Amino acid sequence: MSGHSKWATTKHKKAVIDARRGKMFARLIKNIEVAARVGGGDPAGNPTLYDAIQKAKKSSVPNENIERARKRGAGEEAGGADWQTITYEGYAPNGVAVLIECLTDNRNRAASEVRVAMTRNGGTMADPGSVSYLFSRKSVVTCEKNGLTEDDILAAVLDAGAEEVEDLGDSFEIICEPTDLVAVRTALQDAGIDYDSAEAGFQPSVTVPLNADGAQKVMRLVDALEDSDDVQDVWTNADIPDEILAQIEE
């Protein structure tokens, strides 16, 4: 999970540095709208919606925006788009596998923007299934350390179905099966442990170690993909050492 964990950390820091708050808000709002449409507008009975709302609140999305997105998705307010989820597969430079998850109201536009971003930044598109087999669908819960140890986290979530806990330096990532996400999240709450986010993701079965040059190329490609309003998430199996991450972030 190290490749994903380090990359997720890097993406978060870069998002703040690059002032992409507007794009981040738009993605979080879309997640809420779609979750409400699929599973209903009551967060108490829709764990996916609950988690989408909590993540938006943690990211300082205004409550009014959150509530309007929930209402649009639930059909309580007009204006919701016909969002479609599409996953594209490809390879970044150095043979790094890439999964691109889009949430779009225009399939042709999404496909075009993904293809352009890939080809202009050294990537190649791949046939469905030729890359996704390198990843497993997992759920990821992140929480800040706040004086907690890995043993504290394990004690809280092990019986709830957690598979592993990753130490990211200033936070922990808890990996579990998607079906165990609610149980793990609830176990943390019962133990009085606050969490930052709980969401579905992809865990690579094999990672590709990168040097500084390779890391720069992969990050440039991912940045280009994330510039598209249709792209929700980009997952790679890149393994970028901490010292190289530090160089890139400077």
UniProtKB/Swiss-Prot annotation:
PANTHER family: TRANSCRIPTIONAL REGULATORY PROTEIN YEBC-RELATED, TRANSLATIONAL ACTIVATOR OF CYTOCHROME C OXIDASE 1. Pfam families: TACO1_YebC_N (PF20772), Transcrip_reg (PF01709). Its main location: cytoplasm. InterPro entries: Integrase-like_N (IPR017856), TACO1_YebC-like_2nd/3rd_dom (IPR048300), TACO1_YebC_N (IPR049083), Transcrip_reg_TACO1-like (IPR002876), Transcrip_reg_TACO1-like_dom3 (IPR026564), YebC-like (IPR029072). One of its GO terms (cellular component) is cytosol. The keyword Oxidoreductase does not apply. Keywords: Cytoplasm, DNA-binding, Transcription, Transcription regulation. It is found in: Cytoplasm. GO terms for molecular function: DNA binding. NCBIfam families: PRK00110.1, PRK12378.1, YebC/PmpR family DNA-binding transcriptional regulator. One of its GO terms (biological process) is regulation of DNA-templated transcription. The keyword Lipid metabolism does not apply. It comes from the Bacteria. SUPFAM superfamilies: YebC-like (SSF75625). Belongs to the TACO1 family. It comes from Mycolicibacterium paratuberculosis (strain ATCC BAA-968 / K-10). This is Probable transcriptional regulatory protein MAP_1030.
